[in-house]
Amino acid sequence: VGSEMCIRDRNLYTWDGMFPQEILDGFEKETGIRINYSNFDYDEDMLAKLEETKGGDYDLVIADDYIIELAIQEGLVQKLDTSRISSYDNLNPVFMSQFYDPQNEYTVPYGAGIPLIVYDPGLTDVKITGYEDLWNPALENNVALTANYRVIDGITLKTMGESFNTEDLDVIRAAGEKLLSLAPNIRVINDNNTQDYLISGEVAAAFLYTSQVSTALQVRPDLEVVYPKEGLGFGIMAGFVPAKAPNADAAYAFLDYINQPENAAKCFEYIGYYCTNKAAEEYISEDMKKMIVLPEDAAEGEIVQNISQEAEDLHAEIWNQFKNACD
């Protein structure tokens, strides 16, 4: 009974499957704080819940970059006292100072998704080093793409030296023309299990989400991963303390615990997203490193952000034309 009296609960709100059980158990053993884990399916559901409770009910939330920006704007997030997170300096600066939290006042990154090109050198003689190579006529009817139109339009913009987030409609139209010229090379556009087309040898090259890249490499270690020379596009998940968190102390304790290098390594191996903790990299197993550790020489990254409605509508129109051309 005595030990039960010492157990304090704290409320974590995020997607399902974001932490290995050994981390949750280890934290409770070390601190006496038990985690009540609540899940949401979509970022928008999380924001609605935070709005409803005016930033109360939960001690720590982990969500996607774009929705965190909105939560901060609505006053639902409290500023962090980073002096209370002794492991804070372990974080990788590549994933900090981003659009949703430019001064790093509110959030701690917890994993990044970076879509990449993966190809089968046994099926093509094209030495792929960037997005531009996907246009090579030698890859006719031999490429699979994921179905996120802002990202696919975005990599086309990158081949033109432009930003994913340009609002220049003439530039976006020019990218649309160029994207149409990629259609002959596209075998499939699909968001679900896109890696299967590459694993089976149905296509020679694919543009895949992080989790799909990991799956493909686990099955086919002979596949080549490309960090495109034109620059990476990525999304970041991050933790924050809601404005009226009932147990902010517990949130700080957990953020500190999961960013200790060995603990962070276990977390990133488990979730399969890119490691946002520099000090954890040496503890990540060699076979996982090529899947979740960003190479030192990787090109600069850029996050897809909210843009004007006019630009957004033009992207959607371009995407529909492209999909029709691929059918």
Q: What do the predicted segments below correspond to?
A:
Residues 1-7:
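Short, small-residue-biased leader/transition segments that mark boundaries at the very start
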Residues 8-70:
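Early extracytoplasmic/lumenal segment of secretory-pathway proteins
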Residues 56-63, 78-117, 142-144:
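A structural signal for short loop-to-beta-strand junctions that line the ligand-binding cleft
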Residues 72-79, 95, 101-105, 216-227, ...:
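Ligand-binding "clamshell"
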Residues 78-89, 107, 221-233, 242-245:
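Short beta-strand->loop
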Residues 144-148, 156, 164-228:
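Ligand-binding pocket segment of bilobal, Venus flytrap-like solute-binding proteins
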Residues 237, 242-300:
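Mature extracytoplasmic/periplasmic domains
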Residues 296-327:
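Conserved C-terminal helix/tail region of periplasmic/extracytoplasmic solute-binding proteins
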